[in-house]
Amino acid sequence: MSYLLASALLFALGVYGVLTRRTAILVFLSIELMLNAANLSLVGFARAYGLDGQVAALMVIAVAAAEVAVGLGLIVAIFRHRESTAVDDLSELRG
């Protein structure tokens, strides 16, 4: 059960990071922390109850790797266009 406690703590830290950080890269890292917390809980449940949580965790890791590539590409493109990665600046729409 310590896996679930660690997973809940990591997820809470990720939520805190998403809600308080203002740069896109730190928000992105916080989201990745939340995904890793979900992976940890999947593996913890699989260890405790004999389920196939490892397979689901590997799928989440594969999807997260693709998400990292696309997300960092978007952040770099936004930085080149606006010279800032502040989330508050991204909320302004241009027509």
Curated annotation (Swiss-Prot):
Top EC class, one word: translocase
Compartments, record wording: Cell inner membrane
GO molecular function: NADH:ubiquinone reductase (non-electrogenic) activity; quinone binding
Bilayer-spanning residue ranges: 1-21, 25-45, 59-79
Keywords: Cell inner membrane, Cell membrane, Membrane, NAD, Quinone, Translocase, Transmembrane, Transmembrane helix, Transport
Pfam families the record matches: Oxidored_q2 (PF00420)
E.C. number: 7.1.1.-
Catalytic activity line of the entry: a quinone + NADH + 5 H(+)(in) = a quinol + NAD(+) + 4 H(+)(out)
Gene Ontology BP terms: ATP synthesis coupled electron transport
Physiological role: NDH-1 shuttles electrons from NADH, via FMN and iron-sulfur (Fe-S) centers, to quinones in the respiratory chain. The immediate electron acceptor for the enzyme in this species is believed to be a menaquinone. Couples the redox reaction to proton translocation (for every two electrons transferred, four hydrogen ions are translocated across the cytoplasmic membrane), and thus conserves the redox energy in a proton gradient.
Subunit structure: NDH-1 is composed of 15 different subunits. Subunits NuoA, H, J, K, L, M, N constitute the membrane sector of the complex.
Family membership noted in the UniProt record: Belongs to the complex I subunit 4L family.
PANTHER family in UniProt: NADH DEHYDROGENASE SUBUNIT 4L-RELATED, NADH-UBIQUINONE OXIDOREDUCTASE SUBUNIT ND4L
Name this protein carries in UniProt: NADH-quinone oxidoreductase subunit K
Annotated source species: Thermus thermophilus (strain ATCC BAA-163 / DSM 7039 / HB27)
Biological classification of the source: Bacteria, Thermotogati, Deinococcota, Deinococci, Thermales
Recorded name of the encoding gene: nuoK
